[in-house]
Curated annotation (Swiss-Prot):
Protein's UniProt keywords contain Cell division: no
One protein family per Pfam: Redoxin
Catalyzed reactions: a hydroperoxide + [thioredoxin]-dithiol = an alcohol + [thioredoxin]-disulfide + H2O
Name the UniProt record assigns to this protein: Putative peroxiredoxin
A GO biological process held by the record: cell redox homeostasis
Keywords: Allergen, Antioxidant, Disulfide bond, Oxidoreductase, Peroxidase, Redox-active center
Gene3D superfamilies assigned to the protein according to its UniProt record, in alphabetical order: Glutaredoxin
CDD domains: PRX5_like
Signal peptide: none
Organism: Malassezia furfur (Pityriasis versicolor infection agent)
């Protein structure tokens, strides 16, 4: 992961970037409508909140789709019971793909599936991964970020393209919130 290793230091302010998403509505459950993408500014959206942001290299990819995100969605209430106000899953995929994947995972309004537009947020954290050798290009890395009022509480990543899920897993996140 390139970038400044101090960017994710505890107490640092998060990057102020734009993210895209499609707000969940019950109409999306049918799969017959796709919703309308909108954007939010990270510092505005997360001001005054304790938030868990989980980044993945791509929706519907093996580790993300089979091991990482389904347990997170199923256990989101455990995070909320520990004082977490909001949970976001971010990736470089477009808002339509992220919304469809959130719908597939039955996330409804419990977890927001958002697009890290131009990888700006993850790049500012030094948390991207080059998957060009697999024809995916540069992607958001697999990481978990816990913030409180826009300040970093904890950052943990699963380094490289190892296919291993550990530091960004729901089990690990629950020990840190």
């Amino acid at each position: 992961m390139p970038g400044d290793p101090t960017a994710t230091a505890k107490g640092n302010e998060i990057p102020d970037t734009l993210m895209g998403y499609i707000p969940w509505t019950p109409e999306l459950d049918s799969g017959e409508v796709c919703g309308i993408p909108t954007t939010f500014k990270t510092r505005d959206e997360w001001k005054g909140k304790k938030v868990v942001i989980v980044s993945i290299p791509g929706a519907y990819t093996p580790i993300c789709h089979q091991q990482h995100i389904p347990p997170l969605v199923k256990r989101v209430d455990e995070l909320k019971a520990k004082g977490v106000d909001a949970v976001y899953v971010i990736a470089s995929n477009d808002p339509f793909v992220m919304a469809a994947w959130g719908n597939f995972n039955n996330a409804k309004d419990k977890v927001v599936f958002a697009t890290d537009i131009d990888l700006a947020f993850s790049k500012a954290l030094g948390a991207t991964i080059d998957l060009s050798a697999k024809h995916f290009g540069e992607r958001t890395a697999r990481y978990a970020l816990i913030i409180d009022d826009n300040k970093i509480v904890d950052f943990a990543s699963d380094e490289g393209d190892t296919g291993k899920l550990q530091n960004a897993s729901i089990d690990t996140i629950l020990t840190k919130v």
